[in-house]
Amino acid sequence: MSIHQESLIAAPTQQVFELLTSGSLFSAATGMPAEITDREGDAFSVFGGRVEGRQIELVPGQRVVQAWRFGAAHPSPWEPGVYSTVRFALAPSDQGTRLVIDHTGIPAEWIEHISQGYPTFYQDPLTKFFSN
């Protein structure tokens, strides 16, 4: 199962990329603990460990690809070894950055929950962070 969502963020693509690959910036935007690096292969943890995974592909100013799962701190963590793949594609637009989220390999029972969560936990906080 998969999710596709798009939004506009009022910031250059490089700034959005930096936020998605920096624990301190991501935490500042979301208000929740985050451990993220800008190195491919590194593990990450966001939202206080509710979501965790690994940085698969990082292309500055263009895209972030992650192996993604609900972690041990989530009320309903995924089974060990179960991961989905999320791709955050960044494209320049007149308003700043078009953020395209493609999330694949999601267990069917989680599609609606995750789809509804992206605006709350990603798009809205990023939009607010860059509007200040």
Model-assigned labels for residue ranges:
Residues 20, 80-81, 115-116, 120:
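Short, conserved loop/turn and helix-capping segments at secondary-structure boundaries
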Residues 9, 103-105:
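Hydrophobic beta-strand positions in extracellular immunoglobulin-like domains
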Residues 105-132:
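A conserved amphipathic terminal alpha-helix motif
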Residues 27-31, 35-38, 45, 49-96, ...:
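Hydrophobic-ligand binding "helix-grip"
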Residues 1-35:
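Hydrophobic ligand-binding cavity/cleft-lining segments
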Residues 19, 29, 67, 109, ...:
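Residues that scaffold the ATP/ADP-binding catalytic core of kinase and kinase-like folds
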